[in-house]
Amino acid sequence: MKVPFSWLKELVDIDVTAQELEEKLFSCGFEVEELIPLDAGISKVVVGKIVEMEPQEGTHLTKCVVDCGSYGHDIRISTGASNMKLGDCVPAALDGSTLPGGIKIKARKMQGVESNGMLCSGEELGLNDDLFPGSEVYGLLILPEDSVPGTDIAPVVGLDDYIFDISITANRPDCQSVLGIAREVSAILGKPLHMPAMDYKAVCDADAPVSVKVEAPDLCPRYMAHYVRNIRMGESPRWMKRHLALCGLRSISNVVDITNHTLLEMGQPMHAFDLNKVAGRSITVRRAAEGEKITTLDEKEFTLNPNNLVICDAEKPVALAGIMGGANSGMDDATTSLLFECATFARDSVRKTSRALGQNSDSSARYEKGVDRHSPEMGLARALHLIQELDCGDITTLEYDLTDGRPLERRHIVTTPAKICGVLGITVPDQTMIDILERLEFTVDVQADGSWDVSAPLYREDVESFPDLAEEVIREYGYDHIVPTFLNTASVTNGGLNYDQKQQLKTKRLLAAQGFYEASTLAFYSNAEFDMLHIPADDEARKAIRILNPISENLSVMRTLLAPSMLNVIVDNLKKGNAEGRLFEMALVYLAKELPIQEHPHERQTLCLGAFGPAEDFFTVKGALEALAAGFDLTFTYQRETTSWLHPGISAAVYCNGKRLGVFGKLANEINAELEIAKEQKDSQNIYLGELDYEALMSCVEGGLRYKPLSPYAAVKRDLALVCDEAVACGDIEEAIKKASPLITEVKLFDIYRGANLGEGKKSMAFSLTLSDPAAEVSAEQVERTVKKVLGNLKFKLGIEIR
């Protein structure tokens, strides 16, 4: 939220610099994201008085002699402007000066005549008419006649100001206004707060009846309205235009500006209905009917439902409650009578409608954080005062104040100084705490028994109990008073990881050792992700739980697979120029027994692997899985399996102890062709994915450590190149080899070859066999017999020949 320093000074007698105030606000819990000087980028620009001027022969330029005070009384500057006259004061950017946007001004010749600077327009200084009148005139900015030559330009045109860009947390909706921040500044500096004037006087009766009613008090706890007739549209005064401009708004007309000014100053959103456009001169706050439509002030049409709160006339909706008015009831130059409204709407209702319709506004931003029930009264009073002050219309006696029946009263909290200090862990003098609370507009009534009856201001709905009071005390007293101390206990229990956390950490380290980096994605995506992976319509993975109020349609369902998220991460990396990489993610997937969901879904821990790059292949992921198996003393087996999102010939299912853990392989060609990446990337990239049920994997791990003595005898290795049919699976060959002899302790595939010399439908697979015996050295005869048995088994069971 943007808060001008000069506006704060109107409400509080500030005696510190903007930089000092920024530090004080931060120490009291307000993050100033940026302190913006209005004269940023401007240097060595001063008031210059034109003392001589003559046309520059043969050009459109005018040669001027400018009095710039202490910088020189006869500085010669040429300009292409024509709206100045002798004696005018104008902004002069001297040799070596800078202007907004990084523009540097240097002395140079213009059409053969030396010019020692530049005379500036308002726009060149970053000004507009709302900030300083005349800034948008084509030509030079003409300054007031009494401007002193040589004076820095910033204070002359109002650029000697700062904007505080403050991040307001959700628990402090009372600070969503200049007044809210001014209250805090008043308490911080111990200076009195000058409240904006809110007095007004009704000068006439209503010339026609107006009906106002609330049919949904649960969503609209308070609705206030006041009828103003004989509206006189016109320009706003300069001070109001400047206030709006400093906060980023343009002046429109006096009445519209009053509603915007009230929003910024008081934090109270308000709207004015043109009663000539309100059917039946009737206003009703109700839930929308199914299929009802409204076109808002920004000319967007929305179809509504009963979850949306609307303000209607006798025929149709005229505003989205708390968000934006309708185009069919807005003000224009022909407006003669207005109904000003201020209300409190349920924050959840505004937030859900705003998200569902994708419609946001300054009003909805405030209502979503919360507007207290006292705020409409103050906001409407301030607006009516301004209407009377600016003579915009005649205030009638017709007013409405409709509530949900709850009394409007201050919340009382009974506590003791000891309780507050107990929360803080330090001792703060009683009187100091009372002074702090009273500066923050709390009242403290000290009881006979020493307890305090503290009442919170009406606008502080966030203060509910004595820990909240402790927070108010310490942020004003200073967090630096809190001294770090050890816990008052005989022993301290060090934290640690439980078994599951240790296993997860071990898994991550094993994968990191294989060159994989951890990825972290959101737990939501859209149903379109299932289409991206060509997952069949009847697949269990499509039973995704839909979010009731998603941030966007792209994040509308809870994930049932990690693979779509991993593929999106890979595509994003490729788009950003990362041509290769290895990634893994360990996260939960959410599996519903039935839809719509009736009970809490099963949250299953899942592991996903992703590898991409021209050099990556099937064995990248398989090698990572083998490293994982070795790290947990497991043995994985692999079987051919078809999955919609993997290549049918370059993929496999992973098993351990007979349990299916998951699948891995190369991304299916048809999916790769549909990826939103460059064609050359599609042609050169190899993308591999794998997804495992991590819980099933961990169930195969035996608890405790087991030790096996190393064999004192050297192991023997033999390599076999085998020719088989394309249909023969690698896992079947490995299993047949291992069953041939107990001497075979390890089998590794290290090469696959296909060629015309092998014959059609044939492939060659090369395996490395490790033979060892812990009790004796393996002899050459044993090796020979084992190899013969292996080859015999392979030929008999799978029809495989040695190459």
Where are these regions (language model features)?
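Mobile "lid/hinge" segments at catalytic clefts and subdomain interfaces of large enzymes
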Residues: 114-130, 135-140, 154, 311-408, ...
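Glycine/proline-enriched, intrinsically flexible loops and inter-domain linkers
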Residues: 5, 23, 53-55, 189, ...
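Phosphate-backbone binding interfaces of nucleic-acid-interacting proteins
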Residues: 1-202, 339, 358, 362, ...
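Terminal amphipathic helices with adjacent charged low-complexity linkers/tails
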Residues: 185, 189-214, 391-420
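Extended, well-folded interaction surfaces typified by the phenylalanyl-tRNA synthetase beta subunit core
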Residues: 180, 413-579, 718, 770-777, ...
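Conserved mixed alpha/beta core segments that line enzyme active sites in large multi-domain catalysts
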Residues: 33, 47-78, 246, 259-328
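Beta-rich nucleic-acid/ligand-interaction surfaces
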Residues: 39-43, 200-203, 455, 491-492, ...
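A carboxyl-terminal module marker
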Residues: 2, 20, 27, 438-442, ...
